[in-house]
Amino acid sequence: MEEKYVPARVEEKWQKLWDSNKSFKAEKVEGKSKYYLLEMFPYPSGRIHMGHVRNYSIGDVIARFKRMKGFNVLHPMGWDAFGMPAENAAIQHKSHPAKWTYENIDYMRGQLKKMGFSYDWDRELATCNVEYYKWEQLIFLQMLEKGLAYKKKSSVNWCPRCETVLANEQVEDGSCWRCDSLVEQKELEQWSFRITDYAEELLEDTYKLPGWPERVLTMQRNWIGRSTGCEIDFSIEGRKDAIKVFTTRQDTLFGATFMSLAPEHPLALQLTTAENMIVVNAFLDKVKKTDKIKRTAEDFEKEGVFTGSYCINPVTNRRMPIYLANFVLTDYGTGAVMAVPTHDQRDFEFARKYAIAMEVVIQPEGGSLDVATMTEAYTAEGIMVNSGRFDGLNSAVAKEQIADFLEQEGLGKKTVNFRLRDWGISRQRYWGNPIPVIYCDDCGAVPVPAKDLPVVLPMDATFTGEGGNPLSKIDSFIKTTCPLCGKDARRETDTMDTFVESSWYFLRYCCPDFACGPLDKGKTEYWMSVDQYIGGIEHAVMHLLYARFFTKVLRDLGYCDINEPFTNLLTQGMVIKDGSKMSKSKGNVVDPNALIEKYGADTARLFSLFAAPPEKDLDWSDQGVDGSYRFLNRVWKLVYECLPLISATGPLDAAALTDEGKTLRRLVHKTIRKVSDDIEDRFHFNTAIAAIMEMVNAIQAFEPKNQPRNVPVLKEAVESVVLLLAPFVPHFAEELWESLGHEDNLNEAAWPAFDAAAAVDEELLVVVQVNGKLRGKVTVAASATDEDIKGAVLADEKIRQLIDGMNIKKIVYVPGKLVNIVVG
């Protein structure tokens, strides 16, 4: 064994061995418990950052720990490789997106290997590889056949800078999640997935995921947004059709005084009279420049315009003016809102602004509302008034009775509505998965026959930065023949949202080389579900929801038998420096390469795991990195100095140990239990590492030289330190394990066994209080009775002096912890 710890030499040695031996290759093993550990795969941006280091270090600890516990571990890695940054880089560097992407993958793969992460690299996949995306095209065709994929014209979120459509989930505070440009509204024909068909199941199954953070589940439940209410028809004056409204507040129907339509509502222009057309068109132009999320914000100014038309309240026969309102969306309900200004705050503000009539229909119990003096809407329960036969009822009771009344009279029906909208997947970008559809003037939209897949992304695209989709300019790609009639036809030039690729990659990892379809059912049945998934909470209502949806779709298509993809979910915190998230723009980035070069990968791993619990943000500290490096050097020195003494020692005889030996062994086994629990049950790696550090301190203070019978426990302690450190600092631990004379690698070694008998305390340290104030500590035998302990406390010299001459009223003993003497 070398006297000095040289990280570069140690890490290069073990990385080569792991690579050549395929040490982490996962195979299906019947009869062995499997464990599928997965971190969200990265976009190949060019370099890994400290967020990657932390995320993947967390996962690697769990993977290595589970291997040592005897599990058959699957721990794969791949690349979420399609996406707009590759096109932007192509323009900037005058390089093809494929070249840029694959060069980045090669570099980042090397970085990950230098970190010592225990991936099965034989399962590596890149979503931009045709061998991956061709199966996604087949899944699309099967979804199309089942009616789960469709195309229609709709109002979409449009990023003018990226020149592509964004899903609602990709709009953050009115801006594009990728480039921060203000999002606009645009009418486009686009492909969508019918995720709403699975809304009920997606919602119900959130209650079957006890291993997920409640915060994520709540975010998904709110996004799905199930609400029960009524669908009511309001006839339109002078027309035979009606406006359908969904409401959860049918108890306020008698107070509806006007109708608010979404500007995008199909009846918006039809209901606009000639004298109102100019002002309505101006209003519509203004709304198109405002994104939908901003329009629904509470503090957003409510604006509208009168169409000139009226509808009829079905229960009061009131003539209700029809307005277009900027806060109403077609994305929720029917795109029409029966406005009840006295009992809805948005309607109240709107009615006050445009001088629209109001009617109170719910009074607070024991109170009275007057429209003339109201300063805000009354939205709580109360007593029904001005509501015909329902007057005097509690509004909650009336809500149910009015729903029944509407159904009986044929005026409406009870229904369930979801906030969740179908997932628009069309993107006007080149670097994505081509949608396998052909357009024929005679036959319409025709699916590409499965035998003709894949539709390969052409490599001869030109990237000028002038905007638009490069695919739409490649005649050799666009021009084709109709599969049905053989006439000239053209290909779809939209590509799929990159969230489609990340919605099933975890399944493909189970069978990355399967050539007969998207999934090998036997292998997916063995490995799925993912036992532990790790990634950021920012994916709660995008990737994590889409992945759940896709898993259910693939189940229904017969590819797998699971309902949920991820049994347990850990959402790790960010890495921050100088009070904010690391970013190039803020100049607070720490380069992992520089860190590895100076300290080694194991120090980088150790610090990222020790500095904070995984679910919390990690505050970067250069001093903390130095401290982690010093600790590893201390352990190295300890093993080096102990090696001559322990290398030839015999088996451990617990009965022969001195008191000092028993004390050390007790600490060893308490530490084994704590580290095991902290990794397995809590993922509190920071407290696990702290416990190992305390154990190292105890070993350093241990002096066995004059007591040969204690040498075996020193060996047990030193080997336990190495084994316990193995998941955290694997290169370091492998080198020490080999130096200790072991021929097996640590990924083949067993986790140290906990000996409960060895961990039992022979003595207890009892805290002593007098009238609740700390006055001392007393050591007693662990086997002492309650009365023995009380007697020992009263016999203690210091305590005896404190209570001398006082009247002892009672003695309270908290078993194993403290004695409180109450005196008067």
Swiss-Prot record:
EC number: 6.1.1.4
InterPro entries (alphabetical): aa-tRNA-synth_I_CS (IPR001412), aa-tRNA-synth_Ia (IPR002300), Leu-tRNA-ligase (IPR002302), Leu_tRNA-synth_edit (IPR025709), M/V/L/I-tRNA-synth_anticd-bd (IPR013155), Methionyl/Leucyl_tRNA_Synth (IPR015413), Rossmann-like_a/b/a_fold (IPR014729), tRNAsynth_Ia_anticodon-bd (IPR009080)
Catalysis: reaction(s): tRNA(Leu) + L-leucine + ATP = L-leucyl-tRNA(Leu) + AMP + diphosphate
Chain residues that bind ATP: K584
Example of a GO biological process term: leucyl-tRNA aminoacylation
Residue interval(s) of motif 'HIGH' region: 42-52
GO cellular component terms attached to this protein's record: cytosol
Motif ('KMSKS' region): 581-585
Record localization: Cytoplasm
Molecular function GO terms recorded: aminoacyl-tRNA deacylase activity; ATP binding; leucine-tRNA ligase activity
Keyword line: Aminoacyl-tRNA synthetase, ATP-binding, Cytoplasm, Ligase, Nucleotide-binding, Protein biosynthesis
Coiled-coil residues: none
Family membership noted in the UniProt record: Belongs to the class-I aminoacyl-tRNA synthetase family.
NCBIfam families assigned to the protein according to its UniProt record, in alphabetical order: leuS_bact
Protein's recorded name: Leucine--tRNA ligase
Organism, scientific name: Geotalea daltonii (strain DSM 22248 / JCM 15807 / FRC-32)
Gene (UniProt): leuS
